[in-house]
Amino acid sequence: MVARTPQKQRKVAMVVPPLNSDLLKETINKVDKCMERLQELQYTIAGGTKVVSGVNLSPRSTRIYLKTSLRCKQETLRIKNATNKKSPVGKFPASSPGDWRKMSLPAMLLGETVNEILQASQVTRDIVDAIAPKKSRKSRRLTMSQEDDGPKTPETQQKSREQNPETVSSNIKARRKKEKQNRRSESDSPPSLQRARSRIAFRTISPQVKGNNGENSFRHLANRVSPKHKPWVKKAVLFPNPLFISGTATQQAKFSRTMSPVIARNEISSIKNNKETPYKFLIKSPPTSASKFQVKIRSPPKVLVSPTRNGSNSVRKSPRGSRSPTRTVNLGKKSASISPIRNTGKRSPKLSTAAKLRRSFTPTRNGSNLARKSSISPKRVTLQAFLSPTRNGNFCKKSPKASISPTRVCNKSQKLSTAAKFRRSFSPSRLAMRFVSPMKSRKSVAKCDDHEMVSGLKQRPVLVPKRFSIRRI
């Protein structure tokens, strides 16, 4: 066995660090170089000229002069207050204390620093001289013992320094590997089991990690979302655009209410039928009207004037039973009563809306009601006069011009009959103006009697008073 030194001696050796004389010598050399430079600077400040590292030095060109210029006042005050104190003993003689005040401040600071460096260097030299002979004696003893007695075991100080916890753990691992190899050779089990046993790696799992592996962990979320782990579940759309969801109106309203970031496609597909075409190929057509003869008037009704008497018969030939083409008449920008001048070019063998409108404004019907104009107040005006062309059929039979009907006029599309010209003067806008001012109505009738072509825009009034406005039905 290898002999080892006792632990007590080893502890003593660790406590006392060995002094390296080489390092101390190098530091002394550096200090000497610094001293040489400082002495050169001191010489230039005193008044001489020296060149340090190729640069001409003058008293005010040095950095030390610029740095210490601010401290000049402080140092002068300190010297005045402490006159009894003497400068440290150095190159400057102690017999002449007044020389410091005569010299400049940087020269004084340089002298003090030089003296301090000299003292430090002297101390280091004394230490080197004290250590050097002891080390030489030890080396002599070792050489003499090796020559006489022969080789001996080396000191274990270096080994103790190198041994770290990492090296200890590596030694333990090496021992375990050797033990495993011995067990493999001794065991009679098949090789496959041996390989399996050697491959098992037992990992220590902390309780925090075990707790995190629950439902709220990120790994669990990733397994839930990805189709790799659950191929039977359809993909969920993260942050879908509600504009491109081709669901029902209720489903879109539900989405805007909840504002949930995740909406599964299978939920939407279960709500609506799968046979629907996708939104990219869906062509939305406008809703078809109930009949061809229905008139759509967008603007709300403002004034409805009927000079005729309300008929007793119910609506029979209207498209929807309750509505008729002349239900609303607007005296604003647009009016529902279409003048016959505009529709002369578009007349067809079928009964157009303009022809239906013209039925309710036959000259006989309007002429009979003009006599009753004074008795009817404008507040009692109703919509029922314009409702249906077949309501006032009894009056058509009594009229002297009953033979000329709008259907007959439609067949004669090229020639403009006198009845159609006469009918122009009985448009609803003109009848409304007749109630407002009878003088204007007489002028307009006189113009129409001369068989002049009057445009539809000139027939309509610009302003209508508010007393004729009737609320919506």
Curated annotation (Swiss-Prot):
Coiled coil: none annotated. One of its GO terms (cellular component) is phragmoplast. Disruption phenotype: No visible phenotype. InterPro entries: TAN1 (IPR044709). The keyword Amino-acid biosynthesis does not apply. Residues 131-218, 290-354 are annotated as: Disordered. Strongly expressed in flower buds and root tips. Residues 1-132 are annotated as: Required for binding to TAN and location to the cortical division sites (CDS) during cytokinesis. Interacts with POK1. This is Microtubule-binding protein TANGLED. It comes from Arabidopsis thaliana (Mouse-ear cress). The gene is TAN.
